Amino acid sequence: MAERTTAAVKRRRRPRVVRQHSAGGLVVRGGEVLLIATAGGARWQLPKGRLEEGETPRDAAVREVREETGVTGNVVAPLPGIDYWFAEGARKRIRKHVDYFLLDYVSGSEVDFDSREVSTARWFPWDEALARLTHANERRVVASARRLVEGEVAP
């Protein structure tokens, strides 16, 4: 009886795991790439967000870039995706997968956006963008995109 009770308690304490699927984009304009800042400019990252019902990752990436930056881009190629975990409170863990895409700049201005999630959006040369990115997994995505753009790998 004690074994059942102990097992039941352990099951109740285990956080619930939720899977999320997001998509994001790296927009290139000349020799610069577009990053967003969150948390009042404390964290620099790539624009991304959750897929909407029936939306493809490719379409979600274009939409999220436009919503978060005011910039429109055309998808050139897929980039490596990333996976990570984070917690929402003590009882919920999120396992997130993000598909990334390389986008060519088409139009728009990084000051023409309305987003509660983003403090600012700004263009950076490749090296500065790599130095500013907060998360190592996004630095790997940008480094991969740079190799692709500079012709070191085929699309």
Model-derived regions: residue spans:
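Conserved hydrophobic/aromatic beta-strand scaffold that supports enzyme active sites
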Residues: 26, 35, 100-102, 123
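Conserved Nudix-box catalytic region and its N-terminal flanking loop in Nudix hydrolases
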Residues: 28-74
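Short aromatic/basic micro-patch
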Residues: 45, 95, 123
